[in-house]
Amino acid sequence: MAHARDKAGAVMAMILICETSLIWTSSGSSTASAGNVTGTTAVTTPSPSASGPSTNQSTTLTTTSAPITTTAILSTNTTTVTFTGTTVTPVPTTSNASTINVTTKVTAQNITATEAGTGTSTGVTSNVTTRSSSTTSATTRITNATTLAPTLSSKGTSNATKTTAELPTVPDERQPSLSYGLPLWTLVFVGLTFLMLILIFAAGLMMSAKNKPLDEALLTNAVTRDPSLYKGLV
């Protein structure tokens, strides 16, 4: 009986030591859940087409070298596209394998596309080669300017996406519970361990009560007992 009780006490002490170390480890390594993280805003401005618009697409060009400004208002999405450029020295050019009496004007277009409703402006810069007739002095020639404006505005407004992403909360499996600041699984484990210790203690009391009459009988027995029977217990 003495050896059995010593072993039970040692087992209970080891269990309590292990539980204490687990509690300290869990409370020390537990981290709070991350809060909402605000993402960044990405605005992309596409570059103009590599091939560029064809030579029959032009803004308002005159024979003078003064700055040129043309504003085109698109009826589809009410987006205003403003073309601003400056003409340079005219040079002869050919078209369709035939020399024609025209002069070429290179216009550096600073295109500003203003998105309807938001007021957001997207800038696109491209070098566009346009032609103006030299026979019409001090006059203006516009050829298919309406086809150039929608192409550039669609690149400047449709692809200029603005996204502000709010990342979702990352779930934390070891998030502290409301009671005692410990994870829930730790509290459950500790509760089951204490329940097991209570059952072991109750079983010990039952065995002690069961063996009590036998101990009293051995102590009150008048028959001479052989000391060698208790040699291992003393």
Swiss-Prot record:
The chain crosses the membrane at residues 187-207. Keywords: Glycoprotein, Late protein, Membrane, Signal, Transmembrane, Transmembrane helix. The keyword Glycoprotein applies. Residues 29-62, 116-138 are annotated as: Disordered. This is Glycoprotein BDLF3. Its main location: membrane. GO terms for cellular component: membrane. It is a single-pass membrane protein. The lineage of its organism: Viruses, Duplodnaviria, Heunggongvirae, Peploviricota, Herviviricetes. Belongs to the Epstein-Barr virus BDLF3 protein family. It comes from Epstein-Barr virus (strain B95-8) (HHV-4). Glycans are attached at N36, N56, N77, N96, N101, N110, N127, N144, N159. It is found in: Membrane. The keyword rRNA-binding does not apply. Residues 1-28 form the signal peptide.
